[in-house]
Protein backbone atom coordinates (compact mmCIF):
# COMPACT_ATOMS: atom_id res chain seq x y z
CA UNK A 1 0.00 0.00 0.00
CA UNK A 2 1.18 3.51 -0.76
CA UNK A 3 0.44 4.63 2.81
CA UNK A 4 3.05 2.25 4.33
CA UNK A 5 6.06 4.60 3.91
CA UNK A 6 4.08 7.44 5.52
CA UNK A 7 3.27 5.28 8.56
CA UNK A 8 6.84 4.02 8.83
CA UNK A 9 8.25 7.54 8.63
CA UNK A 10 5.92 9.13 11.16
CA UNK A 11 5.46 6.30 13.71
CA UNK A 12 2.76 8.30 15.60
CA UNK A 13 -0.79 7.93 14.37
CA UNK A 14 -4.49 8.20 15.08
CA UNK A 15 -6.89 5.35 14.36
CA UNK A 16 -10.35 6.75 13.63
CA UNK A 17 -13.53 4.70 14.11
CA UNK A 18 -15.79 5.98 11.34
CA UNK A 19 -19.56 6.26 11.40
CA UNK A 20 -21.65 4.61 8.70
CA UNK A 21 -22.00 7.85 6.71
CA UNK A 22 -18.21 8.06 6.24
CA UNK A 23 -17.77 5.16 3.82
CA UNK A 24 -16.14 7.46 1.24
CA UNK A 25 -13.32 8.20 3.69
CA UNK A 26 -12.81 4.48 4.31
CA UNK A 27 -12.72 3.80 0.57
CA UNK A 28 -10.06 6.47 0.00
CA UNK A 29 -7.79 5.16 2.77
CA UNK A 30 -8.30 1.54 1.70
CA UNK A 31 -6.94 2.50 -1.72
CA UNK A 32 -10.26 1.79 -3.45
CA UNK A 33 -10.17 5.17 -5.24
CA UNK A 34 -7.59 6.88 -7.44
CA UNK A 35 -6.47 9.36 -4.78
CA UNK A 36 -2.76 9.41 -3.94
CA UNK A 37 -1.75 9.12 -0.26
CA UNK A 38 -1.14 12.88 -0.17
CA UNK A 39 -4.57 13.61 -1.68
CA UNK A 40 -6.24 11.34 0.88
CA UNK A 41 -5.08 13.65 3.66
CA UNK A 42 -6.20 16.76 1.73
CA UNK A 43 -9.65 15.40 0.84
CA UNK A 44 -11.44 15.64 4.17
CA UNK A 45 -11.73 18.06 7.04
CA UNK A 46 -9.22 17.13 9.71
CA UNK A 47 -8.37 18.59 13.07
CA UNK A 48 -5.42 17.95 15.33
CA UNK A 49 -5.94 15.96 18.51
CA UNK A 50 -4.27 16.67 21.83
CA UNK A 51 -1.18 14.70 20.78
CA UNK A 52 -0.96 16.56 17.46
CA UNK A 53 -2.11 13.73 15.23
CA UNK A 54 -4.86 14.22 12.67
CA UNK A 55 -8.39 13.17 13.61
CA UNK A 56 -11.26 12.72 11.15
CA UNK A 57 -14.09 15.16 11.84
CA UNK A 58 -17.24 13.26 12.78
CA UNK A 59 -15.51 9.97 13.62
CA UNK A 60 -17.00 8.05 16.54
CA UNK A 61 -13.67 7.47 18.29
CA UNK A 62 -10.02 8.45 18.00
CA UNK A 63 -7.26 6.12 19.22
CA UNK A 64 -3.86 7.85 19.42
CA UNK A 65 -0.67 5.86 19.63
CA UNK A 66 2.78 5.00 18.35
CA UNK A 67 3.93 2.14 16.17
CA UNK A 68 6.10 -0.11 18.33
CA UNK A 69 6.62 -2.97 15.88
CA UNK A 70 5.69 -4.09 12.40
CA UNK A 71 5.69 -7.39 10.57
CA UNK A 72 5.37 -8.26 6.92
CA UNK A 73 3.02 -11.23 6.68
CA UNK A 74 2.40 -12.50 3.17
CA UNK A 75 1.25 -9.52 1.12
CA UNK A 76 0.36 -7.40 4.16
CA UNK A 77 2.07 -5.32 6.80
CA UNK A 78 0.80 -5.62 10.36
CA UNK A 79 1.52 -2.67 12.63
CA UNK A 80 1.52 -3.04 16.40
CA UNK A 81 0.48 0.21 18.06
CA UNK A 82 0.79 1.23 21.69
CA UNK A 83 -2.36 3.27 22.35
CA UNK A 84 -1.82 6.21 24.71
CA UNK A 85 -5.13 8.07 24.34
CA UNK A 86 -8.69 7.06 23.46
CA UNK A 87 -11.37 9.65 22.86
CA UNK A 88 -14.93 8.89 21.85
CA UNK A 89 -17.92 11.04 21.01
CA UNK A 90 -21.46 10.97 22.30
CA UNK A 91 -22.83 10.51 18.77
CA UNK A 92 -25.66 8.02 18.58
CA UNK A 93 -24.99 6.83 15.02
CA UNK A 94 -23.95 3.38 13.78
CA UNK A 95 -20.29 2.55 13.21
CA UNK A 96 -18.89 1.54 9.83
CA UNK A 97 -17.57 -2.02 9.54
CA UNK A 98 -15.69 -3.75 6.70
CA UNK A 99 -16.57 -7.44 6.65
CA UNK A 100 -16.28 -10.05 3.88
CA UNK A 101 -15.16 -7.43 1.36
CA UNK A 102 -18.15 -5.17 2.00
CA UNK A 103 -18.88 -2.14 4.11
CA UNK A 104 -21.66 -2.65 6.64
CA UNK A 105 -23.46 -0.48 9.16
CA UNK A 106 -22.90 -1.76 12.69
CA UNK A 107 -26.24 -0.73 14.16
What is each stretch, according to the model?
Residues 1-107:
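Basic, polyanion-binding surface patches
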Amino acid sequence: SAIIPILQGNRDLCINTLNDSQQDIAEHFAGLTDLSPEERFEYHIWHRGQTGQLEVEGALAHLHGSIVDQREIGTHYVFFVQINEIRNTDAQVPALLYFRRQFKSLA
